[in-house]
């Protein structure tokens, strides 16, 4: 019997998912949570075979929970189930050791099949996301990524020069190049584009 844990902040969807998966002969739902913090503590205590998690949840996101579980050496396999087909989220989920990343508009049978595959050690990802990852190659150099990451944190040009030991002119040139490469209006928009695509 595959032991499942579901974390989803929409109560109705949480209940529906639990009921539908409980109908599968080889699955049982052993726990549920409406936020990421509850999910983290319960998963560490219950050690389910598979955790199905939304990304956008109160207190902690599903991605944050997945990262914490990996740090703590938890053996439960994580499947991210979300409405967000963003390569940035997908890449972060893969780095956090997620065994699956599926979109909520899929069929319950597809989710059940994905759960069975994950238990066998396979990884299951939404085709839309794998296509996006192949299509969108990061155009930024390592240094440009570093500078844009700092800019995304709200650092000024002066802050960046002090942190990276570069002149203000050099940093301005890098930022100008980044904005041009990403076809953005300013550094804020450039950071937003890069974050969404998983480039920084």
UniProtKB/Swiss-Prot annotation:
Localization per record: Cytoplasm
DNA-binding region: 157-176
Chief localization: cytoplasm
GO BP: any one term: phosphorelay signal transduction system
Organism: Bacillus subtilis (strain 168)
Cellular component, GO, one term: cytoplasm
Gene Ontology molecular function, alphabetical: DNA binding
Domain Response regulatory residues, every copy: 3-119
SMART domains associated with the record: HTH_LUXR (SM00421), REC (SM00448)
Record domain HTH luxR-type: where: 133-198
Keywords, ordered alphabetically: Cytoplasm, DNA-binding, Phosphoprotein, Transcription, Transcription regulation, Two-component regulatory system
Protein name (Swiss-Prot/TrEMBL): Uncharacterized transcriptional regulatory protein YvfU
4-aspartylphosphate: residues carrying this PTM: 54
């Amino acid at each position: 019997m595959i032991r499942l844990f579901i974390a989803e902040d929409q109560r109705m969807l949480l209940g529906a998912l639990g009921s539908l998966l409980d109908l599968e002969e080889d699955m049982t739902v052993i726990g549920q949570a409406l936020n990421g913090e509850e999910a983290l503590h319960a998963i560490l205590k219950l050690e389910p075979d598979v955790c199905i998690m939304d990304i956008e949840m109160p207190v902690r996101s599903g991605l944050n929970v997945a990262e914490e579980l990996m740090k703590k050496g938890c053996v439960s396999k994580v499947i991210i189930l979300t409405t967000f087909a963003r390569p940035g989220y997908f890449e972060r989920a893969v780095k956090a050791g997620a065994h699956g990343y599926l979109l909520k508009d899929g069929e319950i049978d597809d989710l059940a099949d994905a759960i069975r595959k994950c238990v066998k050690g396979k990884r299951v990802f939404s085709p839309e996301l794998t296509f996006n990852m192949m299509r969108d190659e990061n155009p930024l150099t390592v240094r440009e990524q570093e500078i844009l990451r700092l800019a995304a944190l709200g650092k000024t040009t002066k802050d960046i020069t002090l942190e990276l030991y570069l002149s203000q002119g050099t940093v301005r040139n890098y930022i100008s190049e980044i904005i041009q490469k990403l076809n953005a209006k300013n550094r804020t928009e450039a950071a937003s584009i890069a974050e969404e695509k998983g480039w920084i």
